[in-house]
Structures are given as structure tokens and as C-alpha cells.
Amino acid sequence: MRQIPLVVVLLLAYAARLQGLISVTNAAVGAKPGPHAGRDLDGSTTSMSVNVDDEERGLSDMLKRLRSMLFDANSATKGQALKKDAKSTKSVKAAGAASNAKKVGQLRHMWNQIKNVEYKGNVKYLAIIYVICILSVLGILGTVFAINRNISNQYIHE
């Protein structure tokens, strides 16, 4: 039972990393100005400005969205909106299919956002490191589970 908070922390860290990558991609697409540096012919820097608001707000926005998804009081209005939809009012089966299609659309949108991240330089190496860390944590948890199960089976047979 002690591993559950660790898994939750790791999942939140992974979500924060993923949200940071997505917010950086969205910031690059938007009209907000990015880092700017002006140089003379001599090579000396004349002016420099950096905008890091999007990266700083990534984790707080993610936590706000998570809180609103978990404790959303507007679930009744969402249900009424599904009932008003012409396709979902035909039958219970159609309502289930409409909500499943909506979920598939959301998953496809998330997958497209992940695919649009450019893995260059440090981002590429960080992604490789995170994958190795996640796989090693899963391996460690699997090993712990196997050891616990083996020990409990030994007590039963004795």
C-alpha cells in the first residue's frame, strides 16, 4: 500500500511534463511573442526579451483542469446537453455510442497533440530518460509484487 502515493506522484510528474510540452507547442502556435534577441554587426547583444509565462503556468493550469474534471458541478447540464442531441435521444444505445464517439474524439485529439511535439535536442533526450525511468519503475513494482506474492505463498505452504 505504500507504493500507491509514489505511483500517484509519478503520474502527476508525467502529466506535468506532458502538459508542459503541450503548452509550449500551443504557445509556439499562438500569436504571443517568443524570445527575441537583437545583435549588432560586431556580435554584441543590443536587446533581449524572454517570455516564460506559458511554461510557468503549465502545472497550475493542469491542476485546475484536473480539479474541474473531478469535481465539476455542471455534470447535470452536460447530461441534459446529451439528451437534447438528436442522435442520442433515439435510444439508449445511440446515447452510449454518441458519448463513446466523443471520448474517442478527445483521445484522438490528445494523441495528435502528443504527435505534434517536436523531439529535438534536449526534449528528445528528456523523453528517452523519462521512458527509461517509467519502465524501470514499472519493472521495480513488478519485481516487488512478485517477491511479495512468493513470500505469501511460502507462508501458506508451511
UniProtKB/Swiss-Prot annotation:
What conditions trigger expression of this protein?
Expression is induced during infection of host grapevine.
Q: Where does this chain mainly localize?
A: secreted
Q: Where is this motif: RxLR-dEER?
A: 39-57
Compartments annotated for it: namely:
Secreted; Host cell membrane
Coiled coil regions in record: none
Keywords assigned: Glycoprotein, Host cell membrane, Host membrane, Membrane, Secreted, Signal, Transmembrane, Transmembrane helix, Virulence
Sugar-bearing residues?
Answer: 150
- Tell me which GO cellular component terms the UniProt record holds: extracellular region; host cell plasma membrane; membrane
- The segment annotated Host BKI1-binding runs over 120-158
Q: Which topology term describes how it sits in the membrane?
A: Single-pass type I membrane protein
Signal peptide positions on this chain? 1-20
TM segment ranges = 127-147
Give the protein's function. Secreted effector that suppresses pathogen-associated molecular pattern (PAMP)-triggered immunity (PTI) in host plants. Suppresses both defense-related brassinosteroid (BR) and ERECTA (ER) signaling pathways in planta by interacting with host BRI1 kinase inhibitor 1 (BKI1) at the host plasma membrane, leading to a host dwarf phenotype.
Q: Which family does it belong to?
A: Belongs to the RxLR effector family.
Domain comment as written in the entry: The RxLR-dEER motif acts to carry the protein into the host cell cytoplasm through binding to cell surface phosphatidylinositol-3-phosphate.
Query: Quaternary form?
Result: Interacts with host BKI1.
By what name is this protein known? Secreted RxLR effector protein 131
